[in-house]
């Protein structure tokens, strides 16, 4: 029976320890605190020696890349401003040259036009003078023909009316009538 009592006492002792959660048992707290501190120190060293330097290196590289990109962008902006300035200067120069060429071409065309106009005016004046001379000849010929026709007609009328025609009197009468 003694063994039964001893077993019952041992079971009762173990039963007291099994009650509740072992994490809340004050008998294990010093051991749990020790392992908590060891774990925290291990995490601290892992973070400070491995993870944080890598993160810091990535951040530094990113900062460097951003700084380099900003510097490159500023440099490209300066180049773009210079290129735009050179483009505007070249454009202005090209416009000035084009305007000079246009003015030169206009002057050449105007000179050719003036020359052609002067030549045409000279031809027209020559033809006009020639035409006026021909008209004057035709007029003179026509007046002479009219005078002869008038003399012949007057002599024929005088003869038809039964009179004798005097050539000098007919000439004088026709000349007086032709003058006005």
Curated annotation (Swiss-Prot):
Keywords: ATP synthesis, Cell inner membrane, Cell membrane, CF(0), Hydrogen ion transport, Ion transport, Membrane, Transmembrane, Transmembrane helix, Transport. It is found in: Cell inner membrane. GO terms for molecular function: proton-transporting ATP synthase activity, rotational mechanism; proton-transporting ATPase activity, rotational mechanism. GO terms for cellular component: plasma membrane; proton-transporting ATP synthase complex. It comes from the Bacteria. It holds the Pfam family ATP-synt_B. The chain crosses the membrane at residues 33-53. InterPro entries: ATP_synth_b/b'su_bac/chlpt, ATP_synthase_B_chain. It is a single-pass membrane protein. Belongs to the ATPase B chain family. PANTHER family: ATP SYNTHASE SUBUNIT B, ATP SYNTHASE SUBUNIT B', CHLOROPLASTIC. F-type ATPases have 2 components, F(1) - the catalytic core - and F(0) - the membrane proton channel. F(1) has five subunits: alpha(3), beta(3), gamma(1), delta(1), epsilon(1). F(0) has three main subunits: a(1), b(2) and c(10-14). The alpha and beta chains form an alternating ring which encloses part of the gamma chain. F(1) is attached to F(0) by a central stalk formed by the gamma and epsilon chains, while a peripheral stalk is formed by the delta and b chains. F(1)F(0) ATP synthase produces ATP from ADP in the presence of a proton or sodium gradient. F-type ATPases consist of two structural domains, F(1) containing the extramembraneous catalytic core and F(0) containing the membrane proton channel, linked together by a central stalk and a peripheral stalk. During catalysis, ATP synthesis in the catalytic domain of F(1) is coupled via a rotary mechanism of the central stalk subunits to proton translocation. Component of the F(0) channel, it forms part of the peripheral stalk, linking F(1) to F(0). The b'-subunit is a diverged and duplicated form of b found in plants and photosynthetic bacteria. HAMAP family: ATP_synth_b_bprime. This is ATP synthase subunit b 2. It comes from Cereibacter sphaeroides (strain ATCC 17023 / DSM 158 / JCM 6121 / CCUG 31486 / LMG 2827 / NBRC 12203 / NCIMB 8253 / ATH 2.4.1.) (Rhodobacter sphaeroides).
